[in-house]
Amino acid sequence: MKIVFAEWGGFGNEDVKAAFVAEGHELIRFLFPAQYGRHNRDAETENRLSALFRQEVPDVMFSLNYFPVISRVCQQEKIRYISWTYDCPCFLLYSATIINSCNVAYVFDKQLYLDFHCAGIETVRYLPLAADTERLDRITIKRSGEQSFQYDLSFLG
């Protein structure tokens, strides 16, 4: 399958790309810097993405997190848009574009999925977060002479 992958500096880009390649999919990078119109229309982004779709003729568009501007172009060009949102709350999911028929918008928060489902929105689905366990298994942890922890508990994220 030919997948256009929106790269915008999100967490997990490398893991997801590696998983797609390992499954034999062809990836086409679409650079999507944070300053581009993620909330509203952005003519430059829309034009670049439309041109890429016409040149590459992909099977699907994929992004980590949901972006209305991408959905808008995918709807226009009749390309399936798959997003996997790991931010919560992700206010971009509440865009009117979420009901576009091109969308398959996965969220890791089951209650958020249920909220959309109960509202009759069928384009949002539930999918837990994932990690590249092979990559994580290669991380070495300092054992001998390691420094004791300064605190009993730390919060990350």
Regions found by a protein language model. Name each.
Residues 1-78:
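N-terminal pre-catalytic "stem/leader" segment of glycosyltransferase-like enzymes
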Residues 78-157:
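Catalytic core of nucleotide-activated saccharide and alditol-phosphate transferases
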